Amino acid sequence: VLHHPALELDFVFSTSNAGNEIAQVHADLEGEELPRFTSELNSDVDVLFLCLGHGNSKIFLENHSFSEATHIIDLSNDFRLKEDRVLGDMEFVYGLPELNASEISKSKYLANPGCFATAIELALLPLASQGLLQDDVHVNAVTGATGAGVSLSKTTHFTWRDNNFSHYKAFTHQHLGEITESVSQVQPDWNREIYFLPNRGNFSRGIFATAYTEFTQDLEAAFELYEGFYKHAPFTFVSRREVFLKQVVNTNKCLIHLHKHKNKLLITSVIDNLLKGASGQAIENMNLMFGLERKLGLELKAYFF
């Protein structure tokens, strides 16, 4: 938001930090000219980003009203699933630009996808678009500590996270629902399972996801399919070289690599969980909603060193 040429920050709402400087909470913003946190809302803004905890966005919108012209982008999971997308007169669109760019460009209310969901959907959608998901899909994905949010917990403490590795919510992660719905949107007859194993890594930012499933064509056919599917996607790139996290951290990119072993296709998908998996994608969606250049404010270089 700070460096987006078409945006002017009107307010940052917080009841717990009202009156405090933003840099008091977000120390990386020290020295920036910013308003203080406020408990007062301006109901006439052009766009509102909701960054509340899961389950709180719906309550917030039920208790606050905004101008008919206000566009709302919600970063929680409150409106991501089809059964949850209507609240009163508001109907939310699922905001994966590589899947729903046309619908996003016409929407006023948007549900920003989850971070794991973004990485995994981008890995699978090209296959689904041609009806080529014919078997179960196995996914193993590792996320950094920032995937757990800012609240302190045992598994985000440095002494626990450092030199450590673990899985959590095996086969039951909350992002499975939106992943399955997105895949079924482009391949309606798909009725197999996604076996998703999420892992906690000992790094701060990024998601490294690998998925494999049956694929009878050769590797070149797979590359041509993926390159064609993402030909016009400004942030999703198919690499013929192996990819790694440092290529995407601090960017809105998703990098994809393919590998074939016997009758299995391995798809590697890497993103920054805080940008393409959250706030960066929210800005990308806002650009689409307002008819702006999709890359505006998002041409960022990776933190490689």
Model segments located where?
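N-terminal Rossmann-like NAD(P) cofactor-binding subdomain of oxidoreductases
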Residues: 1-162, 166-170, 189, 257-261, ...
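A short coil-to-beta-strand element that immediately follows conserved catalytic motifs
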Residues: 9, 135-139, 191-194, 235-239, ...
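Conserved active-site and cofactor/substrate-binding residues in soluble primary-metabolism enzymes
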Residues: 91, 115-122, 170-178, 221, ...
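Short, solvent-exposed beta-strand edge segments and adjacent coil->beta transition regions
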Residues: 107-110, 165, 206-210, 266
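Short Gly/Pro-enriched turn/cap motifs at secondary-structure boundaries
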Residues: 167-171, 199, 244-248
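C-terminal substrate-binding/catalytic lobe of Rossmann-fold NAD(P)-dependent dehydrogenases
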Residues: 172-238
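C-terminal active-site/capping subdomain that shapes the small-molecule cofactor and substrate pocket
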Residues: 209-305
